[in-house]
């Protein structure tokens, strides 16, 4: 786990608690905050925060605006912050509705090899970019693909394996 992310997660949690938000209780379906997602571009250092809330009213809540302002004030590398609504009785992390509450871009960027990826709040992307690069390089060496070979990269999120192997 990355120390920057650990510190930022604590900071986010502290700000939410200070603003009076309660953690979600799955047993009685009560509380405000279901999850906190923090993504950090390994090569770029760009940070995205996604706060998953249980109530639509929290998408435009004054206390939440205060939390966002305090986080941005204390952390220079935050590129964007999103609120995600998940009020469904489900074990899925993210809901369908996403609202951007800070930043101009709707994504952060990172690289695997020579390829640049644009990572949005709901994108599936490798969590450990450094290890993914090692794994993909090992895979490329083992496959020994030729220029006219065809590779299918099915059910693969953004397709980072196929993209890496295409060069």
Show the residue positions of the predicted features.
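Accessory RNA-recognition modules of RNA-modification enzymes
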Residues: 1-167
């Amino acid at each position: 786990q990355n120390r920057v992310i650990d510190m930022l997660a604590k900071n986010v949690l502290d700000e939410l608690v200070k603003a009076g938000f309660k953690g979600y209780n799955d047993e009685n379906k009560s509380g405000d905050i279901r999850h906190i997602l923090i993504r950090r571009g390994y090569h770029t250092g760009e940070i995205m925060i996604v706060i998953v809330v249980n109530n639509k009213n929290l998408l435009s809540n004054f206390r939440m605006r205060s939390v966002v302002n305090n986080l941005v004030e204390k952390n220079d590398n935050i590129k964007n912050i999103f609120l995600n609504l998940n009020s469904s009785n489900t074990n899925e992390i993210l809901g369908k509705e996403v609202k951007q509450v800070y930043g101009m871009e709707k994504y952060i960027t990172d690289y695997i090899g020579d390829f640049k990826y644009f990572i949005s709040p709901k994108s599936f992307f490798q969590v450990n970019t450094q290890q993914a690069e090692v794994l993909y390089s090992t895979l490329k060496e083992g496959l020994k693909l030729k220029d006219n070979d065809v590779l299918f990269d099915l059910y693969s999120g953004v397709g980072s394996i196929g993209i890496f192997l295409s060069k």
